[in-house]
């Protein structure tokens, strides 16, 4: 049983929790994290979701993602999801989420790191992850165009956001 903290519109804890799989009531918000892992060549690590995964089965997705569990910060959730899904330990203590997207059911924090990773060193969570690979910006766009990648509206900007230190060009 996965339990999430519920937040208000200001991202403050409400002292209420939610059980994954139950319907969120209007105004109940929770925290989700996505991690984008780039290698030194500037390629993005992506994962293919299992064909029986709830939500976007058999689609390619960002490096790792999931909901924050009760008591977790965004950073802790991001580190845990990478460990669970890819078997890789990362340390985000000296970084911040690159951006946060507010969606109907909560907040989605996006973490970006650059780390050279050997695919053969990863231990995939077989219940969730079917495959992994590194892709260029062009290959990512081809996967999105062919309907194989989850259609995040900001995919074209991911590679620019990776190195951005300001919101201006």
Curated annotation (Swiss-Prot):
InterPro entries: NUDIX_hydrolase-like_dom_sf, NUDIX_hydrolase_CS, NUDIX_hydrolase_dom
Annotated binding of Mg(2+), by residue: 81, 85
Co-factor(s): Mg(2+)
Keyword Magnesium: yes
CDD domains, per the entry: NUDIX_Hydrolase
Chain location of the short sequence motif Nudix box per the record: 65-87
Superkingdom, natural source: Bacteria
MF GO annotations: hydrolase activity; metal ion binding
EC number(s) given by UniProt: 3.6.-.-
Domain Nudix hydrolase: 28-157
Keyword annotations of the record: Hydrolase, Magnesium, Metal-binding
Family in the record: Belongs to the Nudix hydrolase family.
Protein name, UniProt field: Uncharacterized Nudix hydrolase lin0387
Organism: Listeria innocua serovar 6a (strain ATCC BAA-680 / CLIP 11262)
